[in-house]
């Protein structure tokens, strides 16, 4: 588990010394030793590695890493470029992007371009046992990622939160910064996308907010590979 550096280390480095994190570390280490676990251990903190704290302009909160082979690589909703099957929730995100901003629907689900522009693609739980959704919930990741969210909340500049579904929206009480914008919608899963995710226009709303406050908007178009 490659640790954090830079501003992230200053903001949440103390978490690594807390008893809950020691227990979490031991649990995750044992899981990797005895089961197939995703993402690869070196990718666990990719959301923070790709998006430094002082560059965050949007936070998209997911729940659990993808749990099938060759998918998860540490960014919520994103899959590796070699994965040609785009997960259903991401397909629906692309549909909304197409309807909202006219983005072409790409042939891959690799969202690193967003992360490189300041979109923090954070899951609340950072590891999962293969083919067992939610298998690493309740072991301490939630406490750690709450510290990440709190660090973002403390940033004194315009930031947009996209909170899709009830688990993500349960974090709203933590988000107290008046300079930040909270956008809520149902989850893009096929089970709920038609209840209000489609038509939410979060991507254009985020860019309008950023531009109004003098921040470079996000280029949401993912290119074909």
Curated annotation (Swiss-Prot):
Catalysed conversion reaction: Hydrolyzes single-stranded DNA or mismatched double-stranded DNA and polynucleotides, releasing free uracil
Active site: 64 (proton acceptor)
SMART domains documented for this protein: UDG (SM00986), UreE_C (SM00987)
EC number(s) stated in the UniProt entry for this protein: 3.2.2.27
Keywords: Cytoplasm, DNA damage, DNA repair, Hydrolase
Pfam family, one: UDG
Highest taxon of the lineage: Bacteria
GO cellular component assignments: cytoplasm
GO biological process terms on file: base-excision repair, AP site formation via deaminated base removal
Cellular compartments annotated: Cytoplasm
PANTHER family attached to this UniProt entry: URACIL-DNA GLYCOSYLASE
Similarity comment text for this entry: Belongs to the uracil-DNA glycosylase (UDG) superfamily. UNG family.
Function statement: Excises uracil residues from the DNA which can arise as a result of misincorporation of dUMP residues by DNA polymerase or due to deamination of cytosine.
HAMAP family, sorted: UDG
Record-given protein name: Uracil-DNA glycosylase
Species of the source: Agathobacter rectalis (strain ATCC 33656 / DSM 3377 / JCM 17463 / KCTC 5835 / VPI 0990)
Taxonomic lineage: Bacteria, Bacillati, Bacillota, Clostridia, Lachnospirales
């Amino acid at each position: 588990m490659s640790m954090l550096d830079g501003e992230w280390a200053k903001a949440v480095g103390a978490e690594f010394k807390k008893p809950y994190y020691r227990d979490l570390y031991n649990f995750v280490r044992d899981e990797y030793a005895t089961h197939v676990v995703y993402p690869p251990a070196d990718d666990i903190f990719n959301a923070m590695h790709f998006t430094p704290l002082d560059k965050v302009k949007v936070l998209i909160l997911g729940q659990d890493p993808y749990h099938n082979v060759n998918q998860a690589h540490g960014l919520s909703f994103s899959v590796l470029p070699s994965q040609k099957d785009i997960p259903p929730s991401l397909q629906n995100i692309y549909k909304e992007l197409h309807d909202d901003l006219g983005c072409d629907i790409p042939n891959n689900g690799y969202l690193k371009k967003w992360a490189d522009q300041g979109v923090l693609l954070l899951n609340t739980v950072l590891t999962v046992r293969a083919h067992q959704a939610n298998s690493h919930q309740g072991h301490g990741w939630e406490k750690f990622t709450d510290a990440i969210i709190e660090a973002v909340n403390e940033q004194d500049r315009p930031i947009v939160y996209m909170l899709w579904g009830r688990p993500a929206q349960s974090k709203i009480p933590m988000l107290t910064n008046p300079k930040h914008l909270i956008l809520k919608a149902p989850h893009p899963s096929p089970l709920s996308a038609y209840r209000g995710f489609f038509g939410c226009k979060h991507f254009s709303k985020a860019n309008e907010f950023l531009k109004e406050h003098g921040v470079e908007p996000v280029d949401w178009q993912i290119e074909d590979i």
